UniProtKB/Swiss-Prot annotation:
It catalyses: ATP + H2O = ADP + phosphate + H(+). It is an enzyme of class 3 (hydrolase). Residues 1-44 are annotated as: Disordered. The RuvA-RuvB-RuvC complex processes Holliday junction (HJ) DNA during genetic recombination and DNA repair, while the RuvA-RuvB complex plays an important role in the rescue of blocked DNA replication forks via replication fork reversal (RFR). RuvA specifically binds to HJ cruciform DNA, conferring on it an open structure. The RuvB hexamer acts as an ATP-dependent pump, pulling dsDNA into and through the RuvAB complex. RuvB forms 2 homohexamers on either side of HJ DNA bound by 1 or 2 RuvA tetramers; 4 subunits per hexamer contact DNA at a time. Its EC number is 3.6.4.-. Belongs to the RuvB family. This is Holliday junction branch migration complex subunit RuvB.
Amino acid sequence: MAIKRNQGHGLPPKRDPALGRDALTTSQALPEDQEQSANEDRIRPQRLGDYLGQKDLKEVLGIAIAAAKARREPLDHMLLYGPPGLGKTTMSLILAAEMGVNCKITAAPALERPRDISGLLVGLEAGDILFIDEIHRLNRMAEELLYPAMEDGRLDVTIGKGVSARTRSIPLKPFTLIGATTKVGALTSPLRDRFGLIQRLRFYEVDELIAIVHRSALILEQPITPEGALEIARRARGTPRIANRLLRRIRDYAQVKGYGEISQTVAATALDLYNVDALGLDWTDRLILETMLNHFGGGPVGLEAIAAATGEDSKTIEEVYEPYLLQIGFLNRTPRGRIVSAKARQHLGLIPVEQSTQLDFLP
């Protein structure tokens, strides 16, 4: 299986202004995730059986693979959605490996002109997979080129301009489009309706992350205790990408400090040093919560107001930080805006434990 990546896009990583470090707990891919490509390729599961977690998704895709192989057809077009870092790209590579085909990887922001996506489509061999990350960000022209490609296996190209313009149809080899998005509701209905499979990836449970940490540590030849793996899993925000990133940083710490293995104490001390607390919250998470409490009385407050007060981009707050804060019950979303929960106040040490239940019922 060949993996081809279409470059030319990406945003600079969010940095912790207090510590001057890349935020270890962001679920977005950081440069270090790309630079450590050799280790990343070793850690990344290659087959569906090696993929840990997402049990229901694996069963659905296993059936799709078996059926497509039996009919000697490409997989149906599919849409994978959910928070970043949960394995959407990895799953597309696994599907390509299981089907014995190539996988071309790109992202919607890189497909600015019609020829960008036309070149990718024409270059696909029979059965190949085209993976488009952030597919909700496709521009209108690129999206409209996909419609006949997905439905009828053809590429409609306009030649000329004005009254002399004409459309030429180019036949395409059968292929599978896999779209990935964190915002499935942002897709247009015509595009969304053309996917035969639409599947959601959920946050991982702690026991699933423990298994992932143990597997990665074994591949990296890094001794780790069960308690050390548990400590990493608890602080990984339900996200494998973050779990593996934390493992690499703790491995650095253990090596420099002369520890042979990663114990609970080593993991906790290292993560405290990197400003990742017991629930995986980092400097920016706490900034968001404390700003809402100090400036807006805990809410309700709108997203743009939070962004202005914290100096963070509103999309970054909504797509990177907010999903986990909602998942663990630290934020509530209401028609009037976001509200900091009593559980979050308790975690920040702002109210006694016995008051937390009562405050959750306040308007």
